[in-house]
Amino acid sequence: MTGVFDRRVPSIRSGDFQAPFQTSAAMHHPSQESPTLPESSATDSDYYSPTGGAPHGYCSPTSASYGKALNPYQYQYHGVNGSAGSYPAKAYADYSYASSYHQYGGAYNRVPSATNQPEKEVTEPEVRMVNGKPKKVRKPRTIYSSFQLAALQRRFQKTQYLALPERAELAASLGLTQTQVKIWFQNKRSKIKKIMKNGEMPPEHSPSSSDPMACNSPQSPAVWEPQGSSRSLSHHPHAHPPTSNQSPASSYLENSASWYTSAASSINSHLPPPGSLQHPLALASGTLY
C-alpha cells in the first residue's frame, strides 16, 4: 500500500502545479495566443468557461467580489473557438453622481439670479422716491451759446429737416452732439407749429430775426406834420429823404402838399394880392381824416 501511495502522490502534485501555471501564463499573456488554438484539455475548459473553476488568486466572473474589484474595467474572456466575450462592468449609480450633479446644477442656477439683482439696481439710478412715489430724475438742459443759436437759426430758415450727413457736419462745426442738434430742431418745429396753430406770426418773419444781436424794437408811427413843415420839405426836398418804411398815407400827403405848394407859388406870381390864397392853401395842406 505504501508503494501505491508513493506512486499516486507525485502524479497529483504535478497536476496541481501544472494547472495553475498554465492558467496564470494564459491570463498574463493573452496576446501571445494564436487565433487557432488546439483542442483544449479539461483544465483549459475549466478556465475558459464562465462557470468553471478559477485558480486561486484570481476573481471569478460569478463571484461576489467580481463587480467591486473590476468596477471601472471590463473583464474579457476568450472562448474555445477563439470568439471573445465581455462582462459589462458595474455602473456608477452606486456613487449617486446624478443626484449630486442636479444639486450642483440647482445651486448654479440660483447664483445668477442673485447676481442679477444688484445689476438692476445699478442700471436704474435715475429713479428717485419723492413723497413715497417714484420719480425719474431729468437730465440737465443744454445751454446753447449765442453763436450756436444764431447758426442753428440760420440753418433752420434754410431747411427744417436735416439729413444725417448734414446734421453730423453741423454738430461738428458748432461743437455739439448730433442728439443735441436733432432735439433742437424737433423743439423748434413743434414751437413753430404751435404758433401757427394759434394764428400768431412766427418769430422768423419778424425784422432781423436771424441776427440775435440786432435790436427788434417796433417801428415808430408815422408823424403827421403841420403846414409849415410841409412847406419846408417842399423847399428842401433833399434835406430829409423819405424812408422806405414810411406808410403810404404819409407819402401821399407829402406828394399832395408839394403839388399844392407848387401850384400856390405859380398863382402867387400871377396874382398881386397874396392874402387871398391863405384860405385855400390852408384847406389843401391840412390833415385828411
From Swiss-Prot:
**A Pfam family it matches:** DLL_N
- Residue spans making up a coiled coil are none
* GO CC aspect terms: chromatin; cytoplasm; nucleus
Q: Which UniProt keywords apply?
A: Activator, Deafness, Developmental protein, Disease variant, DNA-binding, Homeobox, Nucleus, Osteogenesis, Phosphoprotein, Transcription, Transcription regulation
The record's subcellular locations are: Nucleus
Chief location of this protein? nucleus
Tell me which residues bear Phosphoserine. S34, S217
In residue numbers, the region (Disordered) covers 1-49, 198-251, 270-289
Matches recorded under SUPFAM superfamilies: Homeodomain-like
- CDD domains, A to Z: homeodomain
What post-translational changes are documented for it?
Answer: Phosphorylated. Phosphorylation of Ser-34 and Ser-217 by MAPK14 enhances its transcriptional activity. Phosphorylation by CaMK2 increases its protein stability.
Q: Which residues pair up as cystines?
A: none
What disease has this protein been linked to? Split-hand/foot malformation 1 with sensorineural hearing loss, autosomal recessive: A disease characterized by the association of split-hand/foot malformation with deafness. Split-hand/foot malformation is a limb malformation involving the central rays of the autopod and presenting with syndactyly, median clefts of the hands and feet, and aplasia and/or hypoplasia of the phalanges, metacarpals, and metatarsals. Some patients have been found to have intellectual disability, ectodermal and craniofacial findings, and orofacial clefting.
**Protein's job:** Transcriptional factor involved in bone development. Acts as an immediate early BMP-responsive transcriptional activator essential for osteoblast differentiation. Stimulates ALPL promoter activity in a RUNX2-independent manner during osteoblast differentiation. Stimulates SP7 promoter activity during osteoblast differentiation. Promotes cell proliferation by up-regulating MYC promoter activity. Involved as a positive regulator of both chondrogenesis and chondrocyte hypertrophy in the endochondral skeleton. Binds to the homeodomain-response element of the ALPL and SP7 promoter.
- What family does the Swiss-Prot or TrEMBL record give for this protein? Belongs to the distal-less homeobox family.
Q: What is this protein identified as?
A: Homeobox protein DLX-5
Organism of this sequence? Homo sapiens (Human)
